[in-house]
A protein has these predicted regions:
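Phosphate/adenylate-binding glycine loop and adjacent helical scaffold
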Residues: 134
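Acidic loop->beta-strand submotif enriched in PP2C/PPM serine/threonine phosphatases
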Residues: 113-129
């Protein structure tokens, strides 16, 4: 196929072909790179609100490690959850007197405005697993109740709200 093939096409065929190419590109982007995702529930208040629409970045973790305090989207038992990564592989996690301790050292959290009940993860987090929680701890169904999250269940990270427009922007 040469360039002359496209030049000699009739305009209607060119138009249809351009739509097909656009659709293929959009589907590839949606499948491999980014997709919109909707916050369902109050477990990430005050950082994220119920019904916020965000961008899920599916590609970053192919090139960088999951970091503490990243906001991630998880697929758990046919349900999608949005939570914050607190514990990384090889670490111990403890909440005591409303303070986070990683490996027995206090780690400041600037996003948690709710009281967190005392909690101790008895063993180290194994390789390939993460401890995640919601920012609104009293209502969050997270690793304290559903267990550690497998790395392959983390679909990507998110922090950018695209709707509603009055909340547009990066929410870390």
């Amino acid at each position: 196929m040469t360039l002359s093939f496209f030049v000699n096409m009739n305009d209607k065929v060119k138009e249809i072909l351009s739509y097909v190419i656009i659709i293929v590109i959009v589907l590839l982007i949606k499948h491999f790179i980014v997709i919109p995702i909707k916050v369902n529930g109050d477990s990430m208040n005050n950082t994220l609100k119920d019904k916020d629409i965000m961008i899920l970045d599916k590609i970053s973790y192919r090139f960088q490690d999951i970091k503490r305090f990243d906001i991630v989207v998880i697929k758990k038992d046919k349900e999608y959850l949005i939570k914050r990564v607190i514990g990384l592989p090889g670490e111990t996690v403890e909440y005591k007197n409303n303070k986070l301790y990683i490996n027995n050292k206090n780690v400041a959290e600037k996003f948690n405005h709710e009281e967190t009940p005392d909690f101790i993860l008895e063993e180290k987090i194994p390789e390939g697993y993460y401890f995640v929680v919601g920012d609104n701890r009293p209502v969050s169904n997270d690793s304290r109740y559903i267990g550690l999250i497998k790395e392959e269940d983390i679909l990507g990270k998110t922090s950018f709200v695209i709707f509603p427009f009055n909340r547009f922007g990066n929410k870390k």
